[in-house]
Amino acid sequence: MARQIKKSGARKTKRNAVNGITHIKSTFNNTIVTITNLKGETLSWSSSGASGFKGAKKGTPFAAQTAAEKAARQAMDQGMRQTEVLVNGPGAGRETAIRALQAAGLEITLIKDITPVPHNGCRPPKKRRV
């Protein structure tokens, strides 16, 4: 019988990045927080869904706050202290996620809104009738 050889796959390496960029994508249904170094390599990420929220609760500001805290904790364990924040999307959790990053202990050096705005491109979804 042949011996099993263990393959050493890609392991998570601890990166020491003091500065980084936090990308917050806030849609109506979910909020995704990704923290990268200055090159754009992901250090940590979290989302409302990954934080345990399901369905309509994923779009709430509290879910965004929980996701931001979780991502910030992981990034700070890898040595991050300062971050720039790039906010994208029209969702409810935008400001709450930024406040949660500050409360977690990250120093925010820049806040930039990079939400794409059409110059009258595609037709938007129809309005809801409740």
Curated annotation (Swiss-Prot):
It holds the Pfam family Ribosomal_S11. Its main location: plastid. The keyword Transmembrane does not apply. The keyword Transmembrane helix does not apply. GO terms for molecular function: rRNA binding; structural constituent of ribosome. One of its GO terms (cellular component) is chloroplast. One of its GO terms (biological process) is translation. It is found in: Plastid, Chloroplast. InterPro entries: Ribosomal_uS11, Ribosomal_uS11_bac-type, Ribosomal_uS11_CS, Ribosomal_uS11_sf. Keywords: Chloroplast, Plastid, Ribonucleoprotein, Ribosomal protein, RNA-binding, rRNA-binding. Belongs to the universal ribosomal protein uS11 family. Part of the 30S ribosomal subunit. This is Small ribosomal subunit protein uS11c. It comes from Pyropia yezoensis (Susabi-nori).
